[in-house]
Swiss-Prot record:
The lineage of its organism: Eukaryota, Metazoa, Chordata, Craniata, Vertebrata. It comes from Daboia siamensis. SUPFAM superfamilies: C-type lectin-like. It is found in: Secreted. The keyword Disulfide bond applies. This is Snaclec 6.
């Protein structure tokens, strides 16, 4: 009886120590600092990638990166799962509402801009973010 209680207590300690780590994420998702991440090998446009992520799990979106440590974690996760050099991150359409100005300070009264919007990809091996047309296709990393 004493051995049963000892084993049961040991299992309880293991279970409680896993709480708040990978135990909170569904299988095949990775855990880091209270969030869950998954790399998908599908190639999608930014808009389709974001829609895809929102359909995976409640609260899921394209990955957002809030620290160097989180970026390192995501880069390692991508490196383990993909050989593709770039993946979408959740920054997109960021220049849609920006105010434009000529370098000589003249007002912008005439524009001949393409209606194309830009989103950001992460160049994995360089660990840099790059603007890219949102219609480019790249793999998907979701986070919730």
């Amino acid at each position: 009886m004493g051995r049963f209680i000892s084993v049961s207590f040991g299992l309880l300690v293991v279970f409680l120590s896993l709480s708040g780590t990978g135990a909170d994420c569904p299988s095949e998702w990775s855990s880091h600092e209270g969030h869950c991440y998954k790399v998908f090998k599908l190639l999608k446009t930014w808009e389709d990638a974001e829609k895809f992520c929102t359909e995976q799990k409640k609260g899921s979106h394209l990955v957002s990166l809030h620290s160097r440590e989180e970026e390192k974690f995501v880069v390692n996760l991508i490196s383990e799962n993909l050989e593709y050099p770039a993946t979408w991150i959740g920054l997109g359409n960021m220049w849609k509402d920006c105010r434009m100005e000529w370098s000589d300070r003249g007002n912008v009264k005439y524009k001949a801009l393409a209606e194309e919007s830009y989103c950001l990809i992460m160049i994995t091996h360089e660990k840099v973010w790059k603007s890219m047309t949102c219609n480019f296709i790249a793999p998907v990393v979701c986070k919730f």
